[in-house]
Amino acid sequence: MKSFLSSCTTGGCGAKIGPGELSKVLSGLPVFQDPQLLVGFDASDDAAVYQINEDTAIVSTVDFFTPMVEDPRTFGRIAAANALSDVYAMGGSPLFALNLVCYPEREDIQDLGEILAGGAEKLQEAGAVLCGGHSIYDREPKYGLAVTGRLNPRQIWKNNTPQPGDRLILTKPLGVGIVMAALRGEMAEAAAVEAALASMQRLNKYAAEKARDFPIHACTDITGFGLLAHTREMAGGSTTIVLYPSALPYIAQAYTYAQGYLLTAAGQRNRNFMEGAVEFGDTPFPLQELMLDPQTSGGLLLSVPGDCAQEALRAIQETEPQAALIGEVLPRQDFPILLG
């Protein structure tokens, strides 16, 4: 059987359409109005939120992509963790999911079974129910989930509502996209691959559960657009976010790979999108690339009031030891993002 990696031109969230191109396409769609639709696609948030009654809202999201690893079950776990993440990023809890499958007709069907088994493992860990799905034949394997969850409509974690004085917490290390590019090029060290796989398979459930004990002003998960583009979305039009590159958690080998100009196409699309929104100044090139690197099943970026940020960080580090304070929120300046 032809390997997963050799059969796919790209993998994971690095396969996402770039943020600039996607914005142009979505701008031509009608904006649907419904008083119960609390978060729609026009908000560029992580999931849709639809209110059912005073105390309950449904959160709905979908995510799928091509493999970035050879092992089918590992791929299934990563894809499921990534799809579930959007529910956690909104402050919700997943209820049920549907499989989304594209699979080559000539590939071993047992490998598809392994993919689905890996996804089911993560759904069980999340406490969600698998209810069915849809499958088609395709030239490249693709897998993901449509996930439905619930939350209190008064406690939605939107991605663009930080407040001046907030501090930013990132719950997972950066660099998985660069490491996966090195793996595809057969240049990745075993320790780097192990760290990246562990991060991508880790549910954001545990960080979200710790964060719920604190007032969260804004939240998003870091995926294919990279830290900088997701931070740009969080800043919106009314605040500026200062990031501290020296405080960023990252997979150590990813810095070395970036230093050797082992880059990703998606990272360069992200760089183009950020032109005019950030000045890198004397920030070392490898750190620039880590901030632009497309993450698959990346961590949560939480905007927390400054007076409880350290306490929140300590709580989150009980389950996510690499979590770090990486920035702060200011009133609007000349740029949406500054590097400190």
From Swiss-Prot:
The record marks K16 as: Important for catalytic activity. The active site is at C13. GO terms for molecular function: ATP binding; magnesium ion binding; selenide, water dikinase activity. InterPro entries: PurM-like_C_dom, PurM-like_C_sf, PurM-like_N, PurM-like_N_sf, SelD_I, SPS/SelD. Mg(2+) binds at D46, D86, D221. GO terms for biological process: selenocysteine biosynthetic process. Its cofactor is Mg(2+). It catalyses: hydrogenselenide + ATP + H2O = selenophosphate + AMP + phosphate + 2 H(+). ATP binds at K16, A43, S44, D45, D63, D86, G133, H134, S135. Its EC number is 2.7.9.3. Keywords: ATP-binding, Kinase, Magnesium, Metal-binding, Nucleotide-binding, Selenium, Transferase. Pfam families: AIRS, AIRS_C. Binds 1 Mg(2+) ion per monomer. Synthesizes selenophosphate from selenide and ATP. Belongs to the selenophosphate synthase 1 family. Class I subfamily. This is Selenide, water dikinase. It comes from Desulfitobacterium hafniense (strain DSM 10664 / DCB-2).
